[in-house]
Each structure stands twice: as C-alpha cells, then as structure tokens.
C-alpha cells in the first residue's frame, strides 16, 4: 500500500480460465503464488500465465519471500510517497456468476471505514483472539472485520492453513479463540465433528455466519 502497489486478490478456487481473464484485465507486473496447495501446482499455472501475458515480469513463490534479496531489483526513481484516502487500495473480484470475475476498485477510505466499524460492531479489542478460517481474498474474511479489522482492533489473529473443521476446532482450543467467521456448511461440519473430538471451546464468544438464509 505504501508504495502504491494495488493488490488483486484471487481466490484459491480460481482456475486457469478465471486467472487468465483476471490477468488480461488487471495487467499485473508481479504474481505472488503458493507453490502447491491441495495437490494443485499453482507455480506451474503461474508460469503458463507469465508466458501468455508479457505484463507479468516476475513470478514470486510465497514460500521463498523471506529468503529473497530485493535489494538488486530495479525500482522506479520516484516512489509513491503517500497514498491518498481516495486512491484505490485494492482490486477485489466479483463473484463471477456471469463468467470471468470483474475487478472492483476499493479506495483506502472505504476499507479503513469497513475494518474499523465492523471491528467495533463485533466488540473486538486487544483482548480478542480472532480466527480467520477461510480465504482472506474474500472481502468478508479480509475486512468484515476479518483479517484487517482484527489487526486494526489490536486482536491476536490466527490464520488457518486449510480451513478444515478439525483444524478450526484445534485452533480454537490451542489459541483460546474468542471470535471467528464461518459459512453455514463449515459451521455444520465443525458442530458434527466436535461431537467426536470434544475440543475445549469455552473461550469462544462470537461466531459470525455469512451467507446464511
């Protein structure tokens, strides 16, 4: 954000068709990707996208970020000094129900407002422990209050690796989670599995349920 880079957050469920459409529209210069996830070789997909889209100058495996030396990279002489509240902070994606997901520009002020007041409405503070079980590339999990709202409130924030029911239950017990957000199907899976696992969930104070009818 500080240097003016505008992230485009793709969902783990996006395949080559969706990713190709997103890249053609956004024209990104970089592509940060996990190497493999749930048996899918995302690094190989990124290599194909880079070959088909010259705009992608660098493919960066997320697992190697901490070991990379960025000092040798060429940087523009004039760095983006300070973002304006009206500038685009992030490009989120539509649901893609009509085909390729569309890019939706969200300004800094928009996201700051969302994360602040969602966190306040959920009663989050520095004593909260927030579990982020689902992909943060979805707006709700990112700032409703989600990851950004949790950090804004000063809460301890725990990110699941795969978001399975057993991982969620274990994380709640291990980190004494106080608040989390799930979709109904995942919540039902957790309730069913808890009958077998019997984790200590006494710390849990609030569950947000998204997409419920």
Task: Indicate residue ranges for each PLM-predicted region.
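A short helix-loop-beta submotif of the ANL/AMP-binding
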Residues: 1-8, 12-16, 25-30, 128-129, ...
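Conserved S/T- and glycine-rich ATP-binding loop of Class I adenylate-forming
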Residues: 88, 93-97, 130, 172, ...
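Structural core segment of the AMP-binding/adenylate-forming
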Residues: 5-68
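Conserved AMP-binding
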Residues: 11-12, 134-139
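Conserved AMP-binding/adenylation subdomain of ANL enzymes
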Residues: 112-129, 139-179, 192-193
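Flexible, low-complexity linker/hinge segments
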Residues: 65-88, 115
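Adenylate-forming
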Residues: 33-43, 163-164, 177-213
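Conserved AMP-binding A3 loop
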Residues: 89-116
């Amino acid at each position: 954000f500080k240097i003016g880079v505008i992230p485009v957050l793709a969902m783990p469920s996006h395949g080559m068709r969706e990713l190709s459409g997103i890249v053609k529209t956004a024209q990104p210069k970089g592509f940060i990707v996990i190497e493999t996830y749930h048996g899918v070789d995302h690094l190989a997909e990124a290599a194909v996208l880079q070959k088909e889209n010259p705009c992608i100058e660098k493919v960066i495996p997320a697992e190697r970020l901490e070991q990379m030396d960025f000092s040798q990279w060429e940087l523009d002489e004039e760095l983006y000094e300070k973002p304006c509240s009206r500038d685009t902070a992030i490009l989120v994606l539509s649901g893609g129900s009509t085909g390729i997901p569309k890019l939706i520009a969200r300004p800094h002020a928009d996201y700051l407002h969302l994360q602040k007041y969602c966190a306040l409405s959920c009663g989050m503070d520095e004593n909260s422990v927030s579990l982020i079980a689902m992909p943060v590339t979805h707006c709700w999990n990112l700032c409703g209050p989600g990851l950004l709202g949790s950090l804004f409130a000063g809460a301890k924030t725990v990110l699941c690796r795969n978001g399975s029911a057993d991982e969620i239950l274990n994380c709640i017990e291990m980190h004494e989670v106080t608040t989390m957000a799930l979709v109904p199907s995942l919540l039902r899976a957790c309730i069913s599995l808890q009958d077998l696992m019997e984790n200590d969930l006494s710390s849990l104070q609030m569950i947000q349920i998204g997409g419920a009818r």
